[in-house]
C-alpha cells in the first residue's frame, strides 16, 4: 500500500478513483507538486492513532481555514484561493484526475494558500480538531441517483456529523447542486446534524464562479440550486 493510498480498509468508499488516462503534464503535476501541497498526518497509514492535526500546522499560522469537499476540477477552489489570499483552503478529492486538474490550475494561478488531500474527506475530518473550520463547501457532489444508493451521498449523518464537529459555531456551509432530490435530502438531513438553514434557491452566491459542472447542468436544462447553512451555536 503506497504512502498516498487514500482508501483505508476500515472504511467503505464508493465511486471512481481513476478516469481517463492522464496527460503527461498532469502526471508531472502529481509527481512534482502534490507532495508539497498534501497535508501530513491525514491517512491511516501516516497517523494510525488518529492524533489531531491542527490547521495551523498545515498553513503555518492561525489564519481562518475553509474546507472544500470534492473539488472536482478545482475551478471553485482556485478562484476562492485567489480572491481570499488571507484564507487557507483545504480541498479533498479522491478522484485522481480531478486532483491533477486542480494542481494544474494551482500552478497556473500561482496561489499558495491551498492544501490538497487526495482522498476521502472523512479521513481529514477524523483528525481535525473540534471547531477548527470557518467555512465549508460542497459543490455539485456525486448525486447517486438510484434510491438504493442515496445513503452514499455526502448529506448523510456519516459525513455531516463529523463535518459539524469540525466547524466553528456560526460557520457557513454552502451546498450547490442541480439535482432536485439532492436538494430535498440536503434540506432534510443537514439541519438534523446541527445546522440552521440561511437561504436556498436558484440565486448563486456573490463570489461564486461558474464551474464546468454548472455549465453542464444548464446545457442539459437543469436548474442549479444553492443552499446556505450556518453551524448552530
Curated annotation (Swiss-Prot):
The active site is at 142. Keywords: Methyltransferase, S-adenosyl-L-methionine, Transferase, tRNA processing. Substrate binds at residues 146, 178, 211-214. Its EC number is 2.1.1.33. Residues 1-36 are annotated as: Disordered. Pathway: tRNA modification; N(7)-methylguanine-tRNA biosynthesis. It catalyses: guanosine(46) in tRNA + S-adenosyl-L-methionine = N(7)-methylguanosine(46) in tRNA + S-adenosyl-L-homocysteine. S-adenosyl-L-methionine binds at residues 68, 93, 120, 142. One of its GO terms (molecular function) is tRNA (guanine(46)-N7)-methyltransferase activity. PROSITE patterns: SAM_MT_TRMB. It is an enzyme of class 2 (transferase). It comes from the Bacteria. The keyword S-adenosyl-L-methionine applies. Belongs to the class I-like SAM-binding methyltransferase superfamily. TrmB family. HAMAP family: tRNA_methyltr_TrmB (MF_01057). Catalyzes the formation of N(7)-methylguanine at position 46 (m7G46) in tRNA. This is tRNA (guanine-N(7)-)-methyltransferase.
Amino acid at each position: 500500500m503506497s504512502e498516498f493510498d487514500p482508501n483505508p480498509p476500515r472504511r467503505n468508499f464508493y465511486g471512481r478513483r481513476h478516469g481517463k488516462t492522464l496527460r503527461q503534464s498532469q502526471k508531472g503535476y502529481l509527481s512534482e507538486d502534490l507532495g508539497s501541497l498534501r497535508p501530513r498526518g491525514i491517512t491511516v497509514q501516516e497517523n494510525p492513532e488518529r492524533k489531531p492535526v491542527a490547521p495551523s500546522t498545515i498553513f503555518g499560522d492561525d489564519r481562518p481555514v475553509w474546507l472544500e469537499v470534492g473539488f472536482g476540477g478545482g475551478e471553485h477552489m482556485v478562484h476562492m484561493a485567489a480572491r481570499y489570499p488571507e484564507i487557507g483552503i483545504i480541498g479533498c478529492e479522491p478522484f485522481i484526475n480531478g486532483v491533477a486538474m486542480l494542481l494544474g490550475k494551482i500552478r497556473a494561478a500561482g496561489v499558495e494558500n491551498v492544501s490538497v488531500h487526495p482522498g476521502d474527506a472523512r479521513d481529514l475530518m477524523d483528525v481535525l480538531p473540534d471547531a477548527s473550520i470557518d467555512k465549508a463547501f460542497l459543490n455539485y457532489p456525486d448525486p447517486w441517483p438510484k434510491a438504493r444508493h442515496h445513503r452514499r451521498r455526502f448529506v448523510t449523518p456519516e459525513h455531516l456529523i463529523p463535518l459539524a464537529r469540525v466547524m466553528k459555531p456560526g460557520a457557513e456551509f454552502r451546498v450547490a447542486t442541480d439535482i432536485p432530490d439532492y436538494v430535498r435530502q440536503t434540506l432534510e438531513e443537514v439541519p438534523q446534524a446541527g445546522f440552521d438553514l440561511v437561504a436556498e434557491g436558484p440565486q448563486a452566491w456573490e463570489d461564486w464562479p461558474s464551474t464546468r459542472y454548472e455549465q453542464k447542468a444548464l446545457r442539459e436544462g437543469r436548474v442549479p440550486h444553492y443552499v446556505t447553512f450556518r453551524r448552530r451555536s
